[in-house]
Amino acid sequence: MDSYKKVLATGKQVAFVIKKGALTFDEKISYKNSFTMRREDVLRKIIDVAAQDFIIATTGKTGRELFELREANGQNHAHDFLTVGSMGHCSSIALGLALNHPEKTFWCVDGDGALIMHMGALAVIGAAKPQNLIHVVINNGAHESVGGMPTAAANIDLTGIARACGYPEVFKATNFDELENYLQLAKAAKKLTFIEVECAIGSRKDLGRPTTTPAENKLKFMEALNDSQI
């Protein structure tokens, strides 16, 4: 570790290549918040209300949990687009889909860290106002998929920002009764809707990863999207 400082001092760059398993987590640092809803349970509610609508999920554990919930329900994944490795882009992808397929309804399931990374998308979405897009932000105030470090979400008003960007319907769910109500309202409203969901930090220890490739996911999603029977 000391040797790289000498290299940097010469104006050169340094890259570390670390083998999987070389680093361990001693659990001395624990990130928590005061929220009670689990993300996986929130996703389960969204799946129930969305039914045959299309879901665009942000990168990380959100997409992984969505995939496993579909597996547990015996459902296929054709109506889900998993934004693997493209943090912050799911809202823009959802906007493009909503504008090009006004006859279908799209649910963008975002995260607070991802939203902040590309917050400019809110202004573009708010200006376009697609009536068939529901933007759900699961806010746990953390970059949980990469260790749980805090985001800036605790210091900003996400619903206020969405409202200022032109979202006509804005809600904030702090418990499951509110969540169920707001999801149903969004489904029926036929208006661009923003829902912030306060969520606890944490996931199952045995949480797996998608067993299909991103390319396979994309092709199945495109087939379902263009199926005239859907």
Where are these regions (language model features)?
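Extended, hydrophobic interaction surfaces within ordered domains
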Residues: 1-17, 21-22
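Glycine-rich beta-alpha junction loops
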Residues: 18-24, 59-63, 140-142, 198-203
